[in-house]
Swiss-Prot record:
PROSITE patterns: RIBOSOMAL_S9 (PS00360). GO terms for cellular component: cytosolic small ribosomal subunit. The initiator methionine may be removed. Keywords: Ribonucleoprotein, Ribosomal protein. It holds the Pfam family Ribosomal_S9. Belongs to the universal ribosomal protein uS9 family. GO terms for molecular function: RNA binding; structural constituent of ribosome. This is Small ribosomal subunit protein uS9. Disulfide bonds: none annotated. One of its GO terms (biological process) is translation.
Length: 160
């Protein structure tokens, strides 16, 4: 028993504390125009996003978000990081997005907005990280294999 107590005391003596200097610090990254920039990715889509303080106007490829993303679900996806951070209507978002389909593009814009928000306000990082907005969704289309009709579907099999 005394041996275990002695070894516990030895372990306690070896304990080191992590100081604030070791922990990563995030700083505000804003350009000379007062905008924060980030890139977001989802499937084959890549979005370049700039945010600046404003009235909450979102522009995608020089078009209003309502005309570019006609489906309400896609518009809701784009708004999620702003709503989670309680910053809806406080930032203007300008983004260019290329590649993929509409769903992938909306996901890329959402990822880009989240990263740009953390560049503008680093204290929002924990809220957005908890919501899963800063994590890149790595799921992509599985490649087609030879000897198969698609990635997994086999050709029709005839017994006779």
């Amino acid at each position: 028993m005394s041996e275990t107590m002695q070894s516990l005391d030895q372990l306690a003596a070896l304990k080191t504390t992590v100081t604030g200097a070791d922990a990563p610090t995030y700083t505000k990254k804003v350009d000379k125009f007062g905008r924060a920039y980030a890139t977001g990715k989802r499937k084959d889509a890549v979005a370049r996003v700039w945010i600046k303080p404003g009235a909450g106007k979102i522009t995608v490829n020089s078009r209003e978000v309502e005309t570019y993303f006609a489906r309400p679900v896609l518009r809701m996806m784009i708004q999620q990081p702003l709503v989670a951070a309680a910053r809806a209507g406080q930032y203007d978002v300008i983004c260019t997005v290329a590649g993929g389909g509409l769903s992938g593009q909306a996901g890329a814009v959402r990822h880009g907005i989240s990263k740009a928000l953390t560049n503008f306000e680093p204290e929002l990082r924990s809220v957005l990280k908890k919501g899963g907005f800063l994590t890149r969704d790595s799921r992509v289309v599985e490649r087609k294999k030879y000897g198969k009709a698609k990635a997994r579907r086999s050709f029709q099999f005839s017994k006779r």
